[in-house]
Amino acid sequence: MRFVLINIFTFLSLAFISQNDSITDTLKKKQKTVDLMEVIIYTPKDNSFGISRLKNVEGTAIYAGKKTEAIYVGDLNANLAANNSRQVFAKVAGINIFENDGSGSQIGIGGRGLNPNRISNFNTRQNGYDISADALGYPESYYTPPTEAIERIEILRGAASLQYGTQFGGMINYKFNDAPTNKIISGNFRQTGASFGFLNSFNQLAGSAGKISYNAFYQYKHYDGWRDNSTLNYHNAFGSVKYKVNSRLSIKGDYTFLNYISQQPGGLTDKQFRDDPYQVTRNRNWFKVNWNLYSVVVDYEINQRTKLNFIAFGLMAGRDALGHLGRPDRVDDTSKYRNLLSDVYNNYGSEIRLLRRYSFLNYQSNVLIGARAYKGSTVRKQGDADKTSRANFSFMNPNDPENSSYLFPSSNYAVFVENIFQFTKNWSITPGVRFENITTSSEGYYRLVNRDLAGNVLLDMRMPDNRSNSRSFVLAGIGTQYKIKTNYEFYANFSQNYRSINFNDMRVNNPNYQVDPNLKDETGFTADGGFRGVVKDLLYFDVSAFLLQYNNRIGTILTTDTLTYNVIRYRTNVSNSRNLGVEAFTEIDWIKLFSKESKHKFSTFVNFSFINAIYTGGQQPAFENKKVEYVPDMIVRTGITYAYKKFSVTGQYAYTSEQFSDATNAVSSSSAIYGIIPAYSVIDVSAGYSWKYFGVFAGVNNVTNSLYFTRRTEGYPGPGILPADPMNGYVTLQFKF
């Protein structure tokens, strides 16, 4: 199959590159028209609000007719040291956030009614390449790029499936700041102190000399936490070297290192949360992450009309979760062994893209063709660890773990084509198609233990479990946009989506949680349309509606364990679901409205989303018309910013309506692993001032000290309710040259 795909791509590439000179002649004859088309394309940053859209064509990617956002970090007042998602993503409509990690070591966001857990419903990238544990089998992101290093965060919704793969949520790309071309050396040193023993040191050097440019940073974090047993020690480093061979060819290599260890205080029951959200239920739970990312990027401008981009990337990483997974209403018996879940990831892949401009009906159009090859290998073990409270991530029997031992190999080969057909100066249509071949397998065993009511072992067997599933399919989509003048446009898109089952959906040993052994892949589509526009530094808006159809949706229901008779969460293909929603964002500078030359800025923004997400029938008709879990009906974020020269201050209010944590829509439970998540609201204030090489930034998050939670979990870092951070403050000192 891989040779067929490579041959298809090679044939298409050569066909486009070897076109005769008639296209060139046509372009020359229509040069005036082509120039006009270039003028109306948005600049990379069309306002100072910190939010924009992506251009129709960015490098070798096509975004015309798609719902996109670009967050410009440098324009934000936010707690960047802690990667505060509530502030960083405040202007992105429809984003639901897990807020249980005050250090920012991991973030969880979901869009349009998709689960926020570790951004697993987005294809997550850094500088254009994958960063998740396994893009197919385990698309969770244990590594979060430091916001202080980022130029912008690029977001593409469900239409991303054609260019970036099969995730329903779309694609998120963290694009780091480029090295300055006019300095041999530049530096950015930011030191942050905050509540609960939080320390963050971010140190960056970058520059250019001749044909070589470089960018490197090191970040250290320490966090004691607002609950006991929450200590974090965190090390993150990045290095990049780019060699510009000539004016048309460049080669860049990136390396990212991450290592951290954190203690986890465990989850709470509803009663424990009401009585004292500061209390802890665990002192033996720990979590460790080790991440190594590497990539090589080649950009080649073949001629004025043709660009080629090639990326090779790899991941060598691991994560270990250690502790006691029992219900939070049960005491951790320190006389018993702890449980260790250990993963080792070794993945590598490559992507190649060819973008060509050509004349169509006397207007400039663009065609993009690309291919992807990816191989993943995950070793997952679960078994007993020692009885202590130390961070000792070692199995008692490493060669024969008590619960399970698996190898999860995976592979993915794909080719895709998208084309912007520019029919008039203002109207374009962008169809696309993607062919996918996916193989996921499991090779290993799990241990089956049955006990009687007295706890005596009746059956203890080692069960071999070897499975393999290979499938090929085609995804198609089409988008359109129509411009009104230069700065306003209507857009609409329809794209098919697909999501394969992941490793967690195959086997996990957890007393609170079981998995259906007959799970099926998820399919569906995303349709959206809207109206957006910008008036530079005065007004930006984007109003849209969407429909997300999700078939064979995997979710959690409540059932009774046939052996223990305890109520547990059971992961299965619950049903089909339908997410229907409206997303709206607008920001206006009221001073610029009356005085365009004023140095003062006084802007307000409103970010609103309404989502109706219900199960609509399928494998489990009993859940028809039940609400989909982790989908609040309403999310509102609004804020106000005042700025004058190098000083700015922002106040922000965020409201999220209530949501359920499982497909049965249970309101409460004694174990707290399922139940309702009540509505909550939070206020944040941040300010900053810069003078020459120096800057000071400060703020208070959760100003009113709201006590709330956004997540219930059946496993680590719980199980149970995971409380959000109370009121906390921070101060950052910056030296930048």
Language-model regions: role of each:
Residues 297-323, 483, 489-495, 499, ...:
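Membrane-embedded beta-barrel scaffold of Gram-negative outer-membrane proteins
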Residues 247-258, 289-449, 483, 542-545, ...:
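Face-selective signature of the C-terminal outer-membrane beta-barrel domain
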Residues 58-60, 69-74, 78-129, 133:
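Extracytoplasmic beta-strand/coil segments of soluble accessory domains associated
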Residues 437, 546-549, 566-665, 704, ...:
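Gram-negative outer-membrane beta-barrel transporters
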Residues 159-161, 171-207, 218, 225-226, ...:
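Short strand-turn segments of transmembrane beta-barrel domains in outer membranes
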Residues 129-157:
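Short acidic/polar hinge/loop motifs at secondary-structure boundaries
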Residues 193-222, 227-263, 286-303, 434:
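Transmembrane beta-barrel wall of Gram-negative outer-membrane proteins
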Residues 551, 601-604, 655-667, 688-737:
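C-terminal beta-signal and adjacent terminal beta-strands/loops
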